[in-house]
Amino acid sequence: MSDDKLIPATPDADAYAKTADANAAEIFDRDEPFALFADWLTEAKKKEPNDANAMALATADASGLPDVRMVLLKDVDADGFVFYTNLESGKGGQLADNPQAALCFHWKSLRRQVRVRGAVEPVSAGEADAYFASRARDSRIGAWASKQSRPLESRFALEKSVAREAARFGLGEVPRPPHWSGFRIRPLSLEFWRDRPFRLHDRMFFDRPDLGSTWTVTRLYP
């Protein structure tokens, strides 16, 4: 049995009552998931203390062992959810071998969650170039300096690599490295979840058999 001081206690009736959404209006009033997601993300941007666009990205390695990490959503539209990374990182290699992924957004301030599952495809070079150019110069230099996910001798070694790349580019442009780009998760399913008292949560599930099909909408038991 784990230390009961480490794990939060199970809420009692009074505690559950305090978690009730003050806005009792129906929040699943969209029949298109991307529009509903845009509504929720807009609300989260106003209430989350930081990084409302943070999402857990789950992939799997060649043996099928799952892997998960937090990344930042950088674009979303009817085609899917976009993030950027070093293509030579662990997630880059896993997605190259198995182009499928799952996402999870969890906004504590809203007591809401969105789960996404789907196929993964690379963004275009033009998209990657445009986003890379929008980043801070030091971040662009860092993308050249960091051999992401590979062993690092010391923090000093990283800082030396950053200084070397900064000197190499001088005052000139810092182009996008060939090993740095983005991926788009094209959903086959999305689930929208809202916390409700006594674990009687609201769940709305959107799914489709393929990317060209229309969405089926199903309310799920909690």
Curated annotation (Swiss-Prot):
Coiled coil: none annotated. Its EC number is 1.4.3.5. Pathway: Cofactor metabolism; pyridoxal 5'-phosphate salvage; pyridoxal 5'-phosphate from pyridoxamine 5'-phosphate: step 1/1; Cofactor metabolism; pyridoxal 5'-phosphate salvage; pyridoxal 5'-phosphate from pyridoxine 5'-phosphate: step 1/1. It is an enzyme of class 1 (oxidoreductase). FMN binds at R69, M70, V71, L72, L73, K74, Y84, T85, K91, Q113, Q148, S149, W193, R203. It comes from the Bacteria. Binds 1 FMN per subunit. Catalyzes the oxidation of either pyridoxine 5'-phosphate (PNP) or pyridoxamine 5'-phosphate (PMP) into pyridoxal 5'-phosphate (PLP). Belongs to the pyridoxamine 5'-phosphate oxidase family. This is Pyridoxine/pyridoxamine 5'-phosphate oxidase. The lineage of its organism: Bacteria, Pseudomonadati, Pseudomonadota, Alphaproteobacteria, Maricaulales.
